[in-house]
Amino acid sequence: MDMDKRIHLELRNRTPSDVKELVLDNCRSNEGKIEGLTDEFEELEFLSTINVGLTSVANLPKLNKLKKLELSDNRISGGLEVLAEKCPNLTHLNLSGNKIKDLSTIEPLKKLENLKSLDLFNCEVTNLNDYRENVFKLLPQLTYLDGYDRDDKEAPDSDAEGYVEGLDDDEEDEDEEEYDEDAQVVEDEEDEEEEEEGEEEDVSGEEEEDEEGYNDGEVDDEEDEEELGEEERGQKRKREPEDEGEDDD
């Protein structure tokens, strides 16, 4: 896929000014130049063009907010002064796997005052004597070269993964906020259901009590009727002897 078509695809109906991260890896650049990328991408902070066949960065637009640039596995051999002009706030630059042979090629990077991390893995320049020491002298603003500082301590976030992880963290935070909101809605619905169930239980409990009370009343009435019946029979038995006595007279 051509680079300009890939850019159009990556936009996903967004405007260029809405894009902060753009990954164009493994697409095809015509004549080894950047194409389809304009200065309308004014908010772009991360650009990756790994293995796209670049031989030059001359067509790079003005990207003042760009902090991380991935150019690894291309055929770039020079012309890096363009980076200082077009991406003045660059902090991470990966040129691994390009045709950089000597220190003079990377000397223009001195103008990138904010550059903290530079990667030159698999470039011929890394075979020079005292390569690391000389690069740190040439670019004193650097903190990490090929993932390690001057004291050979590894960078906390290998290469520029830290920046990408930062973007991912932001997305995760948004997802968590959305999840929390959804969870709260579910909890509220569950609370409402529990309240309704509680009310139903109260109502059914009252009905049961009323039924029990009604039944108790029926039992009491039956007992009263039985007692009355016994009394009446007793009175009849008393009257019968009396009646017999009167007959004798």
Swiss-Prot record:
<keyword id="KW-0539">Nucleus</keyword>
<feature type="repeat" description="LRR 3">
    <location>
        <begin position="65"/>
        <end position="87"/>
    </location>
</feature>
<dbReference type="InterPro" id="IPR003603">
    <property type="entry name" value="U2A'_phosphoprotein32A_C"/>
</dbReference>
<dbReference type="InterPro" id="IPR032675">
    <property type="entry name" value="LRR_dom_sf"/>
</dbReference>
<keyword id="KW-0678">Repressor</keyword>
<dbReference type="GO" id="GO:0042981">
    <property type="term" value="P:regulation of apoptotic process"/>
</dbReference>
<dbReference type="InterPro" id="IPR001611">
    <property type="entry name" value="Leu-rich_rpt"/>
</dbReference>
<keyword id="KW-0805">Transcription regulation</keyword>
<feature type="repeat" description="LRR 4">
    <location>
        <begin position="89"/>
        <end position="110"/>
    </location>
</feature>
<keyword id="KW-0677">Repeat</keyword>
<feature type="compositionally biased region" description="Basic and acidic residues">
    <location>
        <begin position="147"/>
        <end position="156"/>
    </location>
</feature>
<dbReference type="InterPro" id="IPR045081">
    <property type="entry name" value="AN32"/>
</dbReference>
<keyword id="KW-0256">Endoplasmic reticulum</keyword>
<feature type="region of interest" description="Necessary for tumor-suppressive function">
    <location>
        <begin position="150"/>
        <end position="174"/>
    </location>
</feature>
<dbReference type="GO" id="GO:0042393">
    <property type="term" value="F:histone binding"/>
</dbReference>
<feature type="modified residue" description="Phosphothreonine">
    <location>
        <position position="15"/>
    </location>
</feature>
<keyword id="KW-0597">Phosphoprotein</keyword>
<comment type="function">
    <text>Multifunctional protein that is involved in the regulation of many processes including tumor suppression, apoptosis, cell cycle progression or transcription. Promotes apoptosis by favouring the activation of caspase-9/CASP9 and allowing apoptosome formation. In addition, plays a role in the modulation of histone acetylation and transcription as part of the INHAT (inhibitor of histone acetyltransferases) complex. Inhibits the histone-acetyltranferase activity of EP300/CREBBP (CREB-binding protein) and EP300/CREBBP-associated factor by histone masking.</text>
</comment>
<dbReference type="GO" id="GO:0048471">
    <property type="term" value="C:perinuclear region of cytoplasm"/>
</dbReference>
<feature type="region of interest" description="Interaction with E4F1">
    <location>
        <begin position="165"/>
        <end position="249"/>
    </location>
</feature>
<comment type="similarity">
    <text>Belongs to the ANP32 family.</text>
</comment>
<feature type="repeat" description="LRR 1">
    <location>
        <begin position="18"/>
        <end position="38"/>
    </location>
</feature>
<dbReference type="Pfam" id="PF14580">
    <property type="entry name" value="LRR_9"/>
</dbReference>
<feature type="modified residue" description="Phosphoserine">
    <location>
        <position position="204"/>
    </location>
</feature>
<keyword id="KW-0804">Transcription</keyword>
<feature type="repeat" description="LRR 2">
    <location>
        <begin position="43"/>
        <end position="64"/>
    </location>
</feature>
<keyword id="KW-0433">Leucine-rich repeat</keyword>
<feature type="modified residue" description="Phosphoserine">
    <location>
        <position position="17"/>
    </location>
</feature>
<dbReference type="GO" id="GO:0006913">
    <property type="term" value="P:nucleocytoplasmic transport"/>
</dbReference>
<dbReference type="GO" id="GO:0005783">
    <property type="term" value="C:endoplasmic reticulum"/>
</dbReference>
<keyword id="KW-0963">Cytoplasm</keyword>
<feature type="modified residue" description="Phosphoserine">
    <location>
        <position position="158"/>
    </location>
</feature>
<feature type="compositionally biased region" description="Acidic residues">
    <location>
        <begin position="157"/>
        <end position="230"/>
    </location>
</feature>
<protein>
    <recommendedName>
        <fullName>Acidic leucine-rich nuclear phosphoprotein 32 family member A</fullName>
    </recommendedName>
</protein>
<feature type="region of interest" description="Disordered">
    <location>
        <begin position="147"/>
        <end position="249"/>
    </location>
</feature>
<comment type="subunit">
    <text>Component of the SET complex, composed of at least ANP32A, APEX1, HMGB2, NME1, SET and TREX1. Directly interacts with SET. Interacts with ATXN1/SCA1. Interacts with MAP1B. Interacts with ELAVL1. Part of the INHAT (inhibitor of histone acetyltransferases) complex. Interacts with E4F1.</text>
</comment>
<feature type="domain" description="LRRCT">
    <location>
        <begin position="123"/>
        <end position="161"/>
    </location>
</feature>
<dbReference type="GO" id="GO:0005737">
    <property type="term" value="C:cytoplasm"/>
</dbReference>
<dbReference type="GO" id="GO:0005634">
    <property type="term" value="C:nucleus"/>
</dbReference>
